[in-house]
């Protein structure tokens, strides 16, 4: 891998006009400049595409609903050596891409890196416990089940290896395809957790039931998936009802 590899950032979008501009502006403020920004529209009926035109290097369209399908389209068309997904409600620290490149340059054996997610709306104390809980959950999951607690919004992958393992399984209805992809990648090298590689994301998926209660529920489901990785279906996963309301029948 080159010392300054091209990174492809893929942003799946479905009716995100209220938040998309802020996210794309944030990406454009990265200190690392060798990247391409790809927005994949997943059937928006609002102004999302027009907003994307102001910032994206490339806009693609995927008719089949679901973020996995949109991500897959983006990654398939990506030119970068490293591919990264960014949710439309996520924000990167300014040095986020720099940290990713530093991690990959430390060892050729590293095929993917990932880190924790913390909430934009929460305070430092709340996010400290979120970060702590995420780190502990990931450690225990790897020790007992050899499963990585990976979230697509903070997951960087060598494209060559992603292509080699066949990427995401877009035909599966099993929950958390990111966990399964990480397992496939780990057969070809090291999948590394970096606690300091933080992405800020919105707690909007959790607001209905309260953030704390929803976090406990999501941690429980993560463990359920880790211990029963081929049994938990998406219909029972914690984001299902949220995405149903957005009109995505099989968002994963």
Question: Model-flagged regions — what are they?
Answer:
Residues 62-78:
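Glycine-rich, basic loop-to-helix element that forms the pyrophosphate-binding segment
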Residues 119-127, 138-156:
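A recurrent flexible, glycine/aromatic-enriched loop bordering the glycosyltransferase active site
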Residues 26, 41-49, 90:
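A conserved acidic beta->alpha catalytic loop
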Residues 1-26:
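N-proximal low-complexity "stem/linker" segments adjacent to membrane-targeting elements
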Residues 95-125:
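Conserved donor NDP-sugar-binding/catalytic core segment of glycosyltransferases
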Residues 83:
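Short aromatic/hydrophobic "clamp" motif used to bind/position activated sugar donors
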Residues 174-181:
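Acidic donor-binding loop at a coil-to-helix junction in glycosyltransferase catalytic cores
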Residues 25-34:
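Short, acidic, metal-binding catalytic loop of nucleotide-sugar glycosyltransferases
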